[in-house]
From Swiss-Prot:
Keywords: Cobalamin biosynthesis, Lyase, Methyltransferase, Multifunctional enzyme, NAD, Oxidoreductase, Phosphoprotein, Porphyrin biosynthesis, S-adenosyl-L-methionine, Transferase. This is Siroheme synthase 2. Pathway: Cofactor biosynthesis; adenosylcobalamin biosynthesis; precorrin-2 from uroporphyrinogen III: step 1/1; Cofactor biosynthesis; adenosylcobalamin biosynthesis; sirohydrochlorin from precorrin-2: step 1/1; Porphyrin-containing compound metabolism; siroheme biosynthesis; precorrin-2 from uroporphyrinogen III: step 1/1; Porphyrin-containing compound metabolism; siroheme biosynthesis; siroheme from sirohydrochlorin: step 1/1. The active site is at D248, K270. Its EC number is 2.1.1.107, 1.3.1.76, 4.99.1.4. It catalyses: uroporphyrinogen III + 2 S-adenosyl-L-methionine = precorrin-2 + 2 S-adenosyl-L-homocysteine + H(+); precorrin-2 + NAD(+) = sirohydrochlorin + NADH + 2 H(+); siroheme + 2 H(+) = sirohydrochlorin + Fe(2+). Then it catalyzes the NAD-dependent ring dehydrogenation of precorrin-2 to yield sirohydrochlorin. Finally, it catalyzes the ferrochelation of sirohydrochlorin to yield siroheme.
Length: 457
């Protein structure tokens, strides 16, 4: 370990910043946020420094650097564009045993400043030891996407509760189990974010008084159409908190690699060597795991409420009194069309979109007359095997045989394949494709040649 990570208490302590440019301005913001008494020394200052000085937030000393400016300082930062001046600041600070950071020169510095994820009072710092600041920044951005914005509010609220929790629960183990329940409670987090004080109080009281045995719950999470980058931030947070993840074949391996490592994984899809698990059995798996007190994520491709049978699964949980929540996902129609260069709506060609399933419960029948009208886009989910029937029904109800049509296989994935032609050729196009695939019918398909961006990357 080349550096010892520490967090400095600088409130009301004197700090010197040498430099008055944009870089120095960024450092000044950090020092001010930490509550330091900041003196800034430079030949010239950006307008923001003058604003701060006029507001008596810091002190400006215009002129050449002199070592005596470091007297009584706890910490110094050299942030000029003059290497000689930066070296002078570093040497003067070293002589006085004052920690000094030198921007872009870690070897001259006695401390370095990390990339920061600020969820005050929770702080996360990332550093490469000055060897690769860009890598540290990229890691910070990844962590920013994972850590919920409300964490700071939650941490502050937990601080207010500490005395009561210590009084309520006699042992360290009981207190730990309570905090674990509190920090993963979505309702409390949302109430804090909405500043709903009554809901916060009610939820807290429930957590404090209910048995400490963890109450199971189920979260339906939409994984999106395939590309792991299209998974929502909330979806990512949920799969990283899960005790068990129940998933199907439409969830990509890249997304499964993001699941919490020690979570149990239950595959319920249909894949080579596996038989599809009946829906009723899936419902019972969710129910059984939640009744064990586990946090269950039902991870579905696309959006769980768009041909994902999410409603059926939640009805079972509702009847059993199991708490549940839903995290929407990008549905296949939206993702596949965007990655294929096919806008679902367009002022000249389509004023509406119809999302249609290729499967109906026994006895169901589509309203083909309404589907065959102009100025709309049709998107058929799970319709590949029904392509001949879709072609026949639409043409029989008046849709032109030359209506543009496309089929998207493995949409949004690097293996995405798209074929396009006309409605009259739909059965022939389908023979070239494999599931999972989506059928798109409408004049907007004709824009694909112009707007196809993904395959060109």
């Amino acid at each position: 370990m080349d550096h010892l990570p520490i967090f400095c208490q600088l409130r009301q302590r004197d700090c010197l910043l040498v430099g008055g440019g944009d870089v120095a301005e960024r450092k000044a913001r950090l020092l001010l946020d930490a509550g330091a008494n900041v003196t800034v020394n430079a030949l010239d200052f950006t307008p923001q420094f003058q604003v701060w000085a006029d507001s008596q937030m810091l002190t400006l000393v215009q002129g050449e650097f002199i070592p005596s400016l470091l007297d009584n300082c706890w910490l110094a930062i050299a942030a000029t564009d003059d290497e000689t001046v930066n070296q002078q600041v570093s040497e003067a600070a070293e002589a006085r045993r004052i920690f000094c950071n030198v921007v872009d020169a870690p070897r001259q510095a006695s401390f370095i400043m990390p990339s920061i994820i600020d969820r005050s009072p929770l702080m996360v710092a990332v550093s490469s030891g000055g060897t690769s600041p860009v890598l540290a920044r990229l890691l910070r951005e990844k962590l920013e996407s994972i850590l919920p914005l409300h964490l700071g509010q939650l941490a502050r609220y937990a601080g207010h509760l500490r005395a009561r929790v210590k009084q309520q629960f006699a042992t360290v183990g009981e207190r730990r189990r309570f905090w674990e329940k509190l920090f993963v409670n979505d309702r409390l987090a949302q109430s804090l974010a909405n500043d709903d004080r009554q809901a916060v109080a009610d939820t807290t009281e429930q957590l404090l008084t209910e048995p400490l045995e963890h109450r199971g719950e189920v979260v339906l999470v939409g994984a999106g159409p395939g590309d792991a980058g299209l998974l929502t931030l909330k979806g990512l947070q949920q799969i990283q908190q899960a005790d068990v993840v129940v998933y199907d074949r439409l969830v990509s391996d890249d997304i499964m690699n993001l699941v919490r490592r020690d979570a149990d994984r239950v595959f319920v899809g249909k894949r080579s060597g596996y038989h599809c698990v009946p829906q009723e059995e899936i419902n019972q798996i969710l129910l059984r795991e939640a009744q064990k007190g586990r946090r269950v994520v039902r991870l579905k491709g696309g959006d769980p409420f768009i041909f994902g049978r999410g409603g059926e699964e939640l009805e079972t949980l509702c009847e059993a009194g199991i708490p549940f929540s839903v995290v929407p996902g990008i549905t296949a129609a939206s993702g596949c069309s965007a990655y294929s260069g096919i806008p679902l709506t367009h002022r000249d060609f389509a004023q509406g979109v119809r999302l249609v399933t290729g499967h109906l419960k026994t006895g169901g029948e589509l309203d083909w007359a309404n589907l065959a009208v102009e100025k709309q886009t049709l998107v058929f989910y799970m319709g590949l095997n029904q392509a001949p029937a879709i072609r026949e029904k639409l043409i029989a109800h008046g849709m032109a045989e030359d209506m543009p049509a496309a089929i998207v296989e493995n949409g949004t994935a690097v293996t995405q394949k798209v074929v396009s032609g006309t409605l009259g050729q739909l059965d022939i196009l389908a023979q070239q494709m494999a599931s999972p695939a989506l059928i798109i019918v409408g004049r907007v398909v004709g824009l694909r040649d112009k707007l196809n961006w993904f395959s060109n990357h």
